[in-house]
Amino acid sequence: MIGIFIEPNKELKIFINKWKKKIDKKFINTKLISHPPHSTIYYANLINDKDIIQVLKKTIKTIKSFKIYINKTLIFYDDKLTGGDTMCLAINKNDKLFQIQKQIVKKLKIFLKKDSTKSNKLTNSLLLTSMKKYGYPFVGKHWLPHFTIGSIKNKRNSIEFKKFMEEKIKFMNNVNYISAWKIVGNKHILIKRFKLKVNEKN
């Protein structure tokens, strides 16, 4: 599997890792906790081809750096992909992110492996359509960009969940790079960070 990510800056990364450690210490059988802090733009079963790197390089170098803002916590209850409740930090609505996702996915979908667009877990027609077309269920306006903390089962009434939802947060994150990762189970291996075009307005 290949993941295309936005990585958090230092301040945001510290906050995400603080919560990851807190949840990991408190609960067993958590999911996604060991994953490096990131926001997923695209995640799909792509053929392991060096051409992907060249395509990404060409695509990303045309994208100008930009800012994202994170002002609230979010929980995806009964997450179809994890079977638990997934704790996240929501990224404020940003049309630039949707444009970037569209650009990247359009270029990479030709590298999708055969039969990588099937899913037995999804029932939502919007997610199924996206999965069939792109090999990832969250491409388009229904995508909710976020940074994940972790996913936990049957703990939504815990003090930790309550504290997380009550957190007052305010982060601004400069996005100067987009990174590509190889993912095997819970193991994430950085392939390359691609620098975005300098934006004089940033």
Model-derived features: positions:
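Short histidine-centered catalytic/ligand-binding loop motif
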Residues: T86-N94
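Detector for glycine-centered tight turns/loop "hinges" at secondary-structure junctions
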Residues: G185-K187
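Extracellular glycan/ECM-engagement signal in secreted proteins
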Residues: Y177
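Basic, often amphipathic N-terminal segments
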Residues: M1-I70, I75-D78, N94-N174, I189-N202
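Short, low-complexity Ser/Thr-rich regulatory SLiMs
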Residues: Y77-D79, K182-I183
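Short, basic/glycine-rich phosphate-binding loops at helix/coil junctions
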Residues: K80-G84
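Interaction-mediating elements
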Residues: Q101, A180-I183
